[in-house]
A protein has these predicted regions:
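The DNA-contacting recognition helix of HTH DNA-binding domains
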Residues: 16-18
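Arg/Lys-rich, alpha-helical DNA-contact motif
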Residues: 2-11, 29-35, 40-66
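Conserved, function-defining core regions and hallmark residues within catalytic/recognition domains
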Residues: 22
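Glycine-centered, phosphate/nucleic-acid-interacting loop/turn motifs that mediate DNA/RNA or nucleotide
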Residues: 26
Length: 66
């Protein structure tokens, strides 16, 4: 399974800019890139982002989730 950042955003209800932020701070691993430069996410990335989102909903800080 390989999806774009837009599809990842839709699947997890997390804003695209938030996903990019999580990548910048190392909370979400930098994805592979397609030959045209698009980010390409896996099912593992979807699961990780859902975990991060759930942790935030439960009141954990990003540092605690890390």
């Amino acid at each position: 399974m390989s999806i774009t950042i837009g599809k990842l955003s839709q699947a997890t209800a997390v804003n695209v800019e938030t996903i990019r932020y999580y990548e910048r701070i190392g909370l979400l691993a930098a994805p592979l890139r397609t030959s045209s430069g698009y980010r390409s996410y896996t099912a593992q990335d979807v699961a990780r982002l859902r975990f991060i989102k759930r942790g935030r909903e439960l009141g954990f800080s990003l540092e605690e989730i890390r």
